[in-house]
């Protein structure tokens, strides 16, 4: 639920020489590899802006995991982790974090809008438990932009438009949670190789992302029991 607890898991895994990996399935989808190649090749030019949202509408349940602070409830850890992890993949560690939002009667984050700045680039992200949102994402740069259809965190359609007039629309992806097969296959390969960490989502990045969420919660005033 926070960076300190994640760091304890990482330290224990490294001390025992065993495999540990965050189950962030988006990182293991083929589209993520394509996005990484486009960024590495400079197809978008200098990246300036990342946009992403993830909102779903839930009936408030004070005892349910989404609204109960004792269960680390709130939009951030359940939904917001996807746009935040996406921004981390594209821009790396943020230099500054600015967040605003609303809190439920039970004391967890209901809705959060945030800006993560890395150098001159910014990620503008939103997450909410109060409404269903398009769950789309985009990356814009000096040479063009890339759009991901909703929900962007699963198998999504990519659309590339460049200032030079290049337009690419990829075919329909596999649907829904069938995309979890790529995460499972990657984990199986790591086990077969005797690896202790995934190169696609290093453990230090997992801890760093949670540290970002910790800072967002600090700004909002969300504290879990025992912290």
Task: Please describe what each predicted stretch is.
Residues 189-227:
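C-terminal helix-rich "cap/oligomerization" subdomain common to oxidoreductases
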